[in-house]
UniProtKB/Swiss-Prot annotation:
Its EC number is 2.7.7.23, 2.3.1.157. Mg(2+) binds at residues 108, 230. It comes from Psychrobacter arcticus (strain DSM 17307 / VKM B-2377 / 273-4). One of its GO terms (cellular component) is membrane. This is Bifunctional protein GlmU. Residues 254-458 are annotated as: N-acetyltransferase. One of its GO terms (biological process) is regulation of cell shape. Pathway: Nucleotide-sugar biosynthesis; UDP-N-acetyl-alpha-D-glucosamine biosynthesis; N-acetyl-alpha-D-glucosamine 1-phosphate from alpha-D-glucosamine 6-phosphate (route II): step 2/2; Nucleotide-sugar biosynthesis; UDP-N-acetyl-alpha-D-glucosamine biosynthesis; UDP-N-acetyl-alpha-D-glucosamine from N-acetyl-alpha-D-glucosamine 1-phosphate: step 1/1; Bacterial outer membrane biogenesis; LPS lipid A biosynthesis. InterPro entries: Bifunctional_GlmU, GlmU-like, GlmU_C_LbH, Hexapep, Hexapep_transf_CS, MobA-like_NTP_Trfase, Nucleotide-diphossugar_trans, Trimer_LpxA-like_sf.
């Protein structure tokens, strides 16, 4: 029988060195809060209870999680005094089940992997397992003290370590998997009789050893998995490390980056073969790229699906759009939510499309706004065409049927339908439906005054 798993996330720190009114765990890395990373990772496991210990900015933290993770049942526990990590876990005891085991994690250590946590959980055979790492420079970190047989005896904090103990290079990450029964047994016994006058969570290791419990230790695959964030520099460094990992994974999947250090992935990116990504491209949310997609510099793509063989030219913004195969976009195009571009369509420079469908092979090449519209197959939309979809209160639909031709600088005042193969003369204001195959004019007749004299200065 699998032991029930609780997750305790310590998220009470203020993060003074961040110089921010926002709690540290709400700072963002790769477009997601630090705490959000931890929640997403641990809930890839089978978790029975989630307890978050909050402190500074607790209302902000709870509001953020309620908005982003409404589907997760979370127990919130306040740590009103910052008395150390041991005290932070201790305040959860009234909500922590007596049975099962708990992963103890940190809201400012965002990149521990699901695989590492699963291995840590599996290693907890005797009651306590912990994540450790051997580093070149252990200064400031808790040292793992082992006996002659190699068994863990204790964790010694930097300020309490002797000169010999300070030479130890194996350090404590602070991440544990502990039987709940042992937490209920050991945490009430913690003392703050140390240099920091804090209640150290690390003391439960010493207590477990005194009870004859063998402490299991594993190391993460990547050093960055245990790196915490205390200031802006560390946050920026961890951001670049994580982006490097994401880019490397995509390169292994066949993506070519013009410069792997100049791309940001702030979510999940699924890719086909032979994708090219130029410099300065940002992916946000859940994005999918088909085969042979070519994305030029400076584009922002958010929660969108891009079909095979699409070419996205520089500085386009694509937000919650679905793009078919063989589509050309940009430069400087803006696709807003609920835009659908069918196969082989084209959207050119300085075109904005919102909540509209552009049919197969249709073109909107220049300086146009298409909103709340359905555009059929083989339609040509000339430069400067505007669908006037808003009357100040309501949005209305524009329908342009197959093979229609919309002349430049025309305004289509919705609700309006342009029939199959209809032609709209340039400069028209169309306020009524246009029949199939008709030519519609909606402008004043041209007037010419011969020998006109311009005004002159007096």
């Amino acid at each position: 029988m699998i032991s029930p798993l609780s997750v305790i996330i310590l998220a009470a720190g203020k993060g003074t060195r961040m110089q921010s009114a926002k709690p540290k765990v709400l700072q963002t890395l790769a477009g997601k809060s630090l705490l959000g990373h931890v929640l997403d990772t641990c809930h890839q496991l089978t978790v029975d209870d989630t307890i978050i210990v909050h402190g500074f900015g607790g209302e902000q933290v709870q509001a953020h999680i309620a908005e982003q993770y409404a589907h997760l049942p979370i127990t919130w526990v306040a740590q009103t005094e910052q008395l150390g990590t041991g005290h932070a876990v201790k305040v959860t005891l009234s909500d922590l089940p007596k049975e099962g085991q708990s992963l103890i994690l940190y809201g400012d250590v965002p990149l521990v992997s699901c695989q590492t946590l699963a291995t840590l959980q599996a290693a907890n055979i005797y009651g306590v397992s912990m994540l450790t790492l051997t580093v070149d420079n252990p200064f400031g970190l808790g040292r793992i003290k082992r006996d002659k047989a190699g068994n863990i005896e204790a964790i010694i904090e930097q300020k309490d370590a002797s000169s010999d103990e300070q030479q130890i290079q194996e350090i404590n990450s602070g991440i544990y998997c502990v039987d709940n029964a042992l937490l209920h047994k050991f945490l009430p016994k913690l003392s703050n009789d140390n240099a920091q006058q804090e209640y150290y969570l690390t003391d439960i290791v010493k207590m477990a050893v005194a009870d004859g419990i063998t402490i299991a230790a594993i190391e993460p695959e990547h050093t960055f998995e245990i790196e915490g964030v205390n200031n802006r520099q560390q946050l920026a460094s961890l951001e670049r490390t994580w982006q490097g990992k994401l880019v490397a994974d995509l390169q292994e999947a066949g993506v070519q980056f013009a410069d792997p250090t100049r791309v940001d992935i702030r979510g999940t990116l699924s890719v086909g073969q032979d994708v090219f990504v130029d410099v300065g491209v940002v992916f946000e949310g859940d994005c999918t790229l088909g085969d042979n997609v070519y994305i030029e510099a400076g584009c922002v793509i958010k929660n969108s699906q891009i079909g095979n063989a699409c070419h996205i030219k520089p500085y386009c913004v694509i937000d919650e759009a679905t793009v078919g195969a063989g589509v050309d976009i940009g430069p400087f195009a803006h696709l807003r939510p609920e835009t659908v571009l069918s196969d082989n369509s084209k959207v050119g420079n300085f075109v904005e499309i919102k909540k509209s469908t552009i049919g197969h092979g249709s073109k909107v090449n220049h300086l146009s706004y298409i909103g709340d519209a359905t555009v059929g197959t083989g339609v040509n939309v000339g430069a400067g065409v505007i669908t006037c979809n808003y009357d100040g209160v309501n949005k209305s639909q524009t329908i342009i049927e197959d093979h229609a031709f919309i002349g430049s600088n025309s305004s289509l005042v919705a609700p309006v339908t342009i029939g199959d193969t209809a032609t709209i003369a340039a400069g028209s204001v169309i306020t009524k439906d246009v029949d199939a195959s008709a030519l519609a004019f909606g402008r004043a007749r041209q007037t010419q005054k011969d020998n006109f004299q311009r005004p002159t200065k007096k």
